[in-house]
């Protein structure tokens, strides 16, 4: 598949829950074919199967030796078992490594009668050079290159490789009063999140809306409040950098998603800045971004040019 350019599947966009879902098919031990959904999650490094759900719906996997610790940003790590799972996505067959998560995950158990059994992570998308395209809600093989995607043709452009190399996750930069803070570009998230300390330190124009909620990751939850926040996303230009002004609702958390104390360092051992929040799928869908794991760019084409 790495040499093919015609792979494309339609992603399911659910009203009120704008994380993208991909439909996969697989065969159970009795050779019966099943369909299920997986979240297409840019901020999960690994593919994940929700063990009990997968077993309930006839998934057969091949157990591998060893375990792996995984976790959402800011949450405690969870130990998972390792396996390989054979499935079909669109017209392509895959036999891929998965982490088997015991217990449940705070995502719906099904949509329209189709079960949700797991997550496709960014290592899968990097391996097969896939792009999450919010223009037409598809997952497809990267169809751009550094030569045919000019920065001048984009209303927004940020190199995904920076985050993938340093954090293992795609990141963005919010510039506030001359200072840049790091946030994740998280297709699996249904809300924007930002730490209250960042709001305070940066002097953001922020209106607390008063709504209190709890958001949950793979290993835990945290209490948040809704706020309308004005913010500027750093974007590359042909000459230097610029900012794009936005205003959107964020869930304000008491915690960073990834703190310096968690020991994230670059390849030279220098401690990385904390991850103070994330931009979720509803915002990216509204902006019609493309998260392209082939060329490792996040961009929004200027459709009026």
PLM regions and their residue ranges:
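Pepsin/retropepsin-fold aspartyl endopeptidases
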Residues: 1-305
